[in-house]
Amino acid sequence: MAAAAAGLGGGGAGPGPEAGDFLARYRLVSNKLKKRFLRKPNVAEAGEQFGQLGRELRAQECLPYAAWCQLAVARCQQALFHGPGEALALTEAARLFLRQERDARQRLVCPAAYGEPLQAAASALGAAVRLHLELGQPAAAAALCLELAAALRDLGQPAAAAGHFQRAAQLQLPQLPLAALQALGEAASCQLLARDYTGALAVFTRMQRLAREHGSHPVQSLPPPPPPAPQPGPGATPALPAALLPPNSGSAAPSPAALGAFSDVLVRCEVSRVLLLLLLQPPPAKLLPEHAQTLEKYSWEAFDSHGQESSGQLPEELFLLLQSLVMATHEKDTEAIKSLQVEMWPLLTAEQNHLLHLVLQETISPSGQGV
């Protein structure tokens, strides 16, 4: 323990007490946890003293030492069988390790201690996530997964961040499907940053399927109108005229189900999937059925006189431009792709515009050289 703490201290930020002072106080508190004859160790008191020492070290910007104190607090809470306190201490230790990593990278312009604080933070947060799941708190576990994923992405590790975004989405899906789709979108963006285009295509395909499952609602037809009432007799209250009846009391045709925010997810997934398929250009033998169906929608044979029935949620202009792009890419028409890039630029996101640029580069330099 002492050697590990001293090793992490080398990557610490800011002034503070010497390693010997910290280790002396740390050992003094640790001695209270040793089992003695006819004397039970006071774990609760030791946990409080570890916490106090950690707060003092954090105030002095001795981040690694403060983090080690929080880990000691977590061990004390574990001995007391207090799961929430253990999870809280682990989370605080992880955040201190992340601060140490960020500060060292900002000051030294290089990874701190070869990423050891980042690995320690990931380990502590992973343990906290498992504790929250054991306590039946999936929302808290998902929040920690999102926090770790965002930190990894900001620290230049998008591939590792994508996995934690996907785990957060898995935890959020039963109760918060829209938040789960947002987390999957972040995972796909991280995979694009890591140039894992095949993985990003798989995530966008899953997003589209989940958005259809959770966002579409069956249209329920209105009940038939009641039979005409008999003519009122003398002294009876006259029936309301048709103009004063509620607007939904008639037999109007049902309106299509509105997808709301899910429609934006469907549009993003559809456009990104088409661009990724044009970029990857998988051979027919390796083309999955759902991907083949997507490309078939944009062939000229699929276009009918009724407009763009197969376009789904896409605006008509964007659908026609994507259809032209698919045909131009298949024909290797570089000039047509350049012209379409200008027209599609304001209709796409920055991420999608980058994919379109890669499609153009792949057309100019095929066989993966453009990517």
UniProtKB/Swiss-Prot annotation:
UniProt keyword Nucleus present: yes
Any one GO CC term of the record: nuclear body
Expressed in which tissues: Produced abundantly in a wide variety of cell types.
Subcellular location: Cytoplasm; Nucleus; Early endosome; Nucleus, Nuclear body
Biological process per Gene Ontology, one example term: vesicle cytoskeletal trafficking
InterPro entries per UniProt: F8A, TPR-like_helical_dom_sf
Keywords assigned: Acetylation, Cytoplasm, Endosome, Nucleus
Motif (Nuclear localization signal): 34-36
Gene3D superfamilies reported in the protein's UniProt record: Tetratricopeptide repeat domain
Domain of life per record: Eukaryota
Biased composition regions of type Pro residues, renumbered to the chain: 221-235
Segments of this protein annotated with the region Disordered: 213-250
Residues carrying N-acetylalanine: 2
Subunit structure: Interacts with HTT (via C-terminus). Interacts with RAB5A. Found in a complex with F8A1/F8A2/F8A3, HTT and RAB5A; mediates the recruitment of HTT by RAB5A onto early endosomes.
Task performed by this protein: RAB5A effector molecule that is involved in vesicular trafficking of early endosomes. Mediates the recruitment of HTT by RAB5A onto early endosomes. The HTT-F8A1/F8A2/F8A3-RAB5A complex stimulates early endosomal interaction with actin filaments and inhibits interaction with microtubules, leading to the reduction of endosome motility.
Disease: Up-regulated in brain tissue from patients affected by Huntington's disease (at protein level). In a Huntington's disease mouse model overexpression of F8A1/F8A2/F8A3 impairs proteasome activity leading to the accumulation of mutant HTT and causes defective mitochondrial functions.
Protein name (Swiss-Prot/TrEMBL): 40-kDa huntingtin-associated protein
Gene encoding the protein: F8A1
